[in-house]
Amino acid sequence: MNNRQLNVRLFGGTFVFNDTENSGDFFSFALDRPTDYLFDYNYYGRSEDSGLFSQQLILAEGGFKSQLEPAFANKWIATANASTTIWKYIMAYGDAGFVKNHGTNAEFVYDSGLRFILVEDYFEIFFPVYSNLGWEIAQPNYDQKIRFIVTLDFK
């Protein structure tokens, strides 16, 4: 297969000083969906917690596709994201990493699934298959676990 791809992305971050753990995770590292307090990303449902726009994915910080707990790290985070071509615009993806919060041990998190690229970097759909939560594809409300990338800001 001539058009096989392997994409690898690494992210690591630590806080030298962070005393905001009592006031929430607004400035913490995100595992799957950054808070975007500087409005750098094109979130269409910026403050949505449920519904279609809450499933929008921005590949930043942890870069995970599944919504796992802990969702944020207020001490440090280290993640790896990878995907490889299965056939044409269908890819398998996998993410793994460690999330550390104050007062708890570092937690290992992982997810995997299928990525359908309709228009690369502009319209992609992610179907989670297996993660820390088990077989996501067999769990209730699977349609709410599907993530997507939509970018209307052309480069």
What positions do the PLM features span?
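Outer-membrane beta-barrel strand-turn architecture
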Residues: 1-4, 84-88, 117-122, 154
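C-terminal outer-membrane beta-barrel translocator/porin domains of Gram-negative envelope proteins
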Residues: 1-85
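Transmembrane beta-strands of outer-membrane beta-barrel proteins
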Residues: 6-10, 90-94, 114, 123-125, ...
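Transmembrane beta-strands of outer-membrane beta-barrel pores
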Residues: 12-18, 94-102, 120-122, 127-134, ...
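Flexible, surface-exposed loop regions and adjacent strand-edge segments
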Residues: 24-31, 107-109, 142-145
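Transmembrane beta-barrel architecture of outer-membrane proteins
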Residues: 75-79, 109-113, 145-147
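Outer-membrane beta-barrel "beta-signal"
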Residues: 114-123, 142-155
